[in-house]
Amino acid sequence: MTIAWAIFKKELRTFFVSPLAYVFLGVFLLLAGFFFSMGVSLTGEASLRIMLANLSISLLFLLPLLTMRHFADERRSGTFELLMTAPVPLWAMLLGKWFASLALCVILLLGTLLFPGILAYYGDPDWGVILTGYLGLLLACSAFVSAGLFSSSLTDEPVAAGLIGVVLLL
């Protein structure tokens, strides 16, 4: 399990040292804010239903783009062969990469927790619906990350892996 933990830390570190991470987080939070404001202003009720539904569709397109580099870049840079010849079990490599991507999804969703707070300040939202909505979004993220990792394992090109992942999820 320590090997999976090391891969998890490496993947997170690799993601957050690039400016792409912060652009990705910013775009996601802007989309979430737009969906939240449109959902509340159009329906006039204290509900996150529209935001969560639109975020799940947005994540369907964004998460394969996030996971497209996991295996494809490792193959292109030659580190995949190094990993396969090292005493690293395949399950540990997959688990580390999957948990790192899922941790990024959790970070994305933590950024949207401001919106239920706004609803609670101005209204009386149904917390059971909000919690199950977030749980459903987390489970959808888990499935989307799995599909993205699978598509990344099929090809050496990250862009092709991203396209395969999106098509697979559609």
Positions of predicted regions on the chain:
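Hydrophobic alpha-helical membrane-insertion segments
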Residues: 164-170
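Long, hydrophobic alpha-helical segments
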Residues: 53-73, 108
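Transmembrane helix boundary and interhelical loop/hinge segments in multi-pass membrane proteins
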Residues: 48, 66-84, 98
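Short, hydrophobic transmembrane alpha-helix segments
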Residues: 37-47
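Aromatic- and glycine-rich beta-strand/loop motifs that create alpha-glucan
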Residues: 1-21
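Hydrophobic alpha-helical transmembrane segments of multi-pass membrane transport/permease proteins
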Residues: 19-38, 54-63, 170
